[in-house]
Swiss-Prot record:
Entry's Gene Ontology molecular function annotations: oxidoreductase activity
Name of the protein in its database record: H(2)-forming methylenetetrahydromethanopterin dehydrogenase-related protein MJ1338
InterPro entries the UniProt entry points to: 6-PGluconate_DH-like_C_sf, HMD_C, HMD_C_sf, HMD_N, HMDII/III, METHMP_Hmd, NAD(P)-bd_dom_sf
Lineage: Archaea, Methanobacteriati, Methanobacteriota, Methanomada group, Methanococci
Coiled-coil ranges (or none): none
Species the sequence originates in: Methanocaldococcus jannaschii (strain ATCC 43067 / DSM 2661 / JAL-1 / JCM 10045 / NBRC 100440) (Methanococcus jannaschii)
Amino acid sequence: MRNIRKIKVDNMKVSVYGAGNQNLYINKLNLPEKFGGEPPYGGSRMAIEFAEAGHDVVLAEPNKNIMSDDLWKKVEDAGVKVVSDDVEAAKHGEIHVLFTPFGKATFRIAKTIIEHVPENAVICNTCTVSPVVLYYSLEPILRTKRKDVGISSMHPAAVPGTPQHGHYVIGGKTTDGKELATEEQIKKAVELAKSAGKEAYVVPADVSSVVADMGSLVTAVALSGVLDYYTVGRKIINAPKKMIEQQVIMTLQTMASLVETSGIEGMVKALNPELLIRSASSMKLLDRQKDLDAALEILQNLDETLKAEVEKAEIKPTTLVAAQSLVKEIKTLIGGAAAEGAIKRSARKLFEH
């Protein structure tokens, strides 16, 4: 982990929701041995680090049994105030960090606290929900009674408390220009991260989950493949840049669409790993294509259980289209609120976990 110098900023009022499942971190994932660091991990560690940076921190956790008494003592000894009531925490913070469970619980907590947060507060997701979906779930009140409240991210992109956690991913303006939070609110989130000695990466809100969630494994491998093909296509084959980009779009869109309709197993069945190994092997044109070597090895040694599941899988009807072209068509042919509604509903489906 890079050694990031802490910066001194004005004292902030911070509310963290959720201490983190210590049984999962310590006993099931065995983080102390695998990654290092020391408990408590998760939201409670974030609260500790924010408090140690000089901020006024409240940790809301209704389930005291989620941690042992000695770990709770560590939290309180750091200067964190522990409460069981989300509303009490809501009234406290100018920055609200949701280290909350996957699913409906996070939306329920967000809808509870937004009524009570101070003026110009910012509510930040972590790893259990996309900031885009969080915004959509709160949109009715954000566009009426609480226009002052911003939505961003304070995504650790690692488990807080492990040496790997040296950064936060913060959601900024979306790729289509939507401002879910003001520049001042995003700046506060950046300053909070840096004050705790973390690197702050501001990325488009609708990209944050792709680079910060567990699916970043897929992002990294896919990006490596794209860049490998780009290098080979341009330097060795001398293919036109537009053609390379079009084939990348076709490949990624096809895979994504098949997963959406037919699941992982259905996608694998449609792509036929045996055939893919043969065709992709012919693209091994440089010695340094280590990513392709690794991919071919994985495809040649698929798990027998997965093979059986793929054999039984169904390839369901899938309409393969260029997504951005379809959006333009909908806006042109339908237009207005109907088009925006259809696009928004589709976006929610994309970003929901």
